[in-house]
Amino acid sequence: MAKLTKRMSVIRDKVDATKQYDINEAISLLKELATAKFVESVDVAVNLGIDARKSDQNVRGATVLPHGTGRSVRVAVFAQGANAEAAKAAGAELVGMEDLADQIKKGEMNFDVVIASPDAMRVVGQLGQVLGPRGLMPNPKVGTVTPNVAEAVKNAKAGQVRYRNDKNGIIHTTIGKVDFDADKLKENLEALLVALKKAKPTQAKGVYIKKVSISTTMGAGVAVDQAGLNASAN
């Protein structure tokens, strides 16, 4: 058996894997145990009561967290004419059509989010093999294919998170940085859970949000007692 590092030994001693923690206690634990030499992200895993093998029970979408994620986001937009000008005014770093597609084909991908107006999808469609595996392909379900590209750019810059369940029915995303105030992390988590509840597939039966765990980039997961969260998020 591999020897635990000193840091992991401390985490194992502090975190009771069988316990669901009050959200305030959970956040306090994360802050106490976040000893990496960089500001760690706070990540969340939400186990959903869905059958991920069935396409009509998969959950996918996006929501803007009230306090953002703490990340600086670079946005690329496929648009032309007035839409292109609006995207630039909203703060998009890269805006174009065929010229932007050519950059991407050359491997120049200095961006975190790709947004496209519907009329630009004829160009973006050529990039599926490049953008798809990186999770960057624009999609109307998460608001990245839209006639209102300026609003989409503003949302991305404001701390929008995209979510999609994995094959085990678990959503993985981030809700901020460990140096955020505890109240801000809590409110971001509640906002995410509200969005997930709204996205509940009609075919999903039984308990929908089965388990919520939060962790830092380098830390262990801490299970959260949903009773301590905003009732509308449960």
UniProtKB/Swiss-Prot annotation:
UniProt feature coiled coil, ranges: none
GO cellular component: cytosolic large ribosomal subunit
Keywords: Repressor, Ribonucleoprotein, Ribosomal protein, RNA-binding, rRNA-binding, Translation regulation, tRNA-binding
InterPro entries (alphabetical): Ribosom_uL1_bac-type, Ribosomal_uL1, Ribosomal_uL1-like, Ribosomal_uL1/biogenesis, Ribosomal_uL1_3-a/b-sand, Ribosomal_uL1_CS
Entry-linked SUPFAM superfamilies: Ribosomal protein L1
GO molecular function: rRNA binding; structural constituent of ribosome; tRNA binding
Pfam families given in the database record: Ribosomal_L1 (PF00687)
CDD domains with a match to the protein in the record: Ribosomal_L1
One example of a Gene Ontology biological process annotation: translation
NCBIfam families the record matches: rplA_bact
Role noted for this protein: Binds directly to 23S rRNA. The L1 stalk is quite mobile in the ribosome, and is involved in E site tRNA release. Protein L1 is also a translational repressor protein, it controls the translation of the L11 operon by binding to its mRNA.
Subunit-structure text: Part of the 50S ribosomal subunit.
Name listed for the protein in its UniProt record: Large ribosomal subunit protein uL1
Species lineage: Bacteria, Pseudomonadati, Pseudomonadota, Gammaproteobacteria, Enterobacterales
